[in-house]
Amino acid sequence: MNDSGEDFRVRPGRIRGKSGGKPKSFINQVLKAAKKAGHSSSHSGGGKRPSGLGRSTFGRGRIAFSRNRLFSSSRRVVVKARIARHQGRAFRSAPMSAHLSYLKREGVTHDGEKACMFEARNDRADDLAFADRGQHDRHHFRFIVSPEDAGEMTDLKAFTRDLARQMEADLGTGLDWVAVDHWNTDNPHIHLLVRGVDQSGKDLVISRDYISHGLRSRAEELVSIELGHKPERDVRSALERDVDAERWTRLDVEIRIAADETGYINLRPVSPGAGDADSRHLMIGRLQKLERMGLAAPAGPGEWMVGLEAERSLRDLGLRGDIIKTMHRAFTEQGHDRGIGDYVIETGTAASPIIGRLVDKGLHDELTGEAYAVIDGTDGRAHHVRFRGVDAFEHSPPVGGIVEVRHFGSTDDRQPTLVLAGRSDIDLAAQVTAPGATWLDHRLVEREPMPLSMGGFGQEVRDAISARAAHLAEEGLGRRQGQRVILQRDLLDTLRRRELDAVGTKLSAETGLPYKGAAIGEHVAGTYRQRLTLTSGRFAMIDNGLGFQLVPWSPPLEKQLGRHVSGIAKGGGGIEWSLGRKRELGL
């Protein structure tokens, strides 16, 4: 299929060198080049096949794939690996402690509880001590081991320990490692973290070949020992499913091996027989699917040209499919109905701000630590946004809260740093009757109304704004004028002050300390006791020994918990903090 979506056919005949005309598709350009190089069985006008054409001598040009490889009865295991450096130019990972914390999150175990790391001799490993031991290492290794039939295995922990012992034997050194098994995906898998030092304390260097092939082979041997060989009918069934899959498959790997550097593949049988008939049948079926996808084209009887961009396109399609499944599952679990046509997979270059309800967040790539968030946008679309790491969520609200994706970096930065900023910890429904100054109240009083869609979350916000205005009128904070509600002046300050006074009175009764508000220009000083999540935002409790104040919280304060802090109350409710020698403006 070409760029216009219409089917095309390669017609035998002489290639004409006319200039101008319509632009040719990538496949047609490759076919033209291949014909010149002799990779085509197309006949010339006289009916005789020119010598050299269709008789490729490339070693990988003919049916070079092996039935043994495709129909292997060994249990398959996917192993992904990454070397995470702790410093230097290649340092891109979140701290090991943060990575460990996320691996232990709730919802990844059999019962949905918080996971627990294990080690060689203990089912409850001290992962914090493991991170502490490795903080001065040059690097560590992250492995994801995913047996295809993990659900049938008796004990993934025992399997992991056997695999780690085999690694130690292969590498000739003891290993310091921790691991955790995850059951939150279609196929259970193990995260294995190995310190980057050997038993003598020297840097541990593992050959790329062992990481790429050796470890996987060892894992497959262990699974095959436990479960036995895979029945041929199961192998065949899996390959038949691969024929029509819109992702990178084992069949595509074999096609890549069999093709030459131009993408030409010859599937004409050298010696027809049962030995390769099944493999060839599957390959042809797969190539026909690639043709329908616009990624391959027939070049003659039993001959094909595969677009050089096919692998990347298939991998991108597979990734897109995984993202769509993640988004659909997230919206379904939260009880929201959003059509796939409204899904947007962001690339980090969105022209307009992404603001909306947080539907889900997690690890996009558990190996690299890349994170993602699913946002039900005020523009009526469902956004999937990727972040460099889970540290982008450090101060984000819980699922259901209101968020905004913020960009940090220059305007021409191709990969700006993205942070998920909280706009409200309170979900939309609760804001309608909440006591403080809500995110909805800010929408009611802003001079330039936020653009809101007529469907999806945008419409939900429209309805919630109307309901909030009606509630404020009932509370005496506005009056009706026909179909409109005229709100009182200083609405936000009034609502914020009411909530702080109510919370301050409650805390005063609990602590026995008097509550005192902070006036503009007033010096605020004392011990930072706790953070409070209120309708009006996040506030810090500052105890000066004689009483306490509730002032706007800001991220730099969190590291000062239990310590003495000081600052000056600014207009608009912010505090300009003096933390050591650095002054921070808390808004």
Task: Show the residue positions of the predicted features.
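N-terminal nicking endonuclease/strand-transfer module with a His-rich metal-binding environment
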Residues: 1-188, 193-587
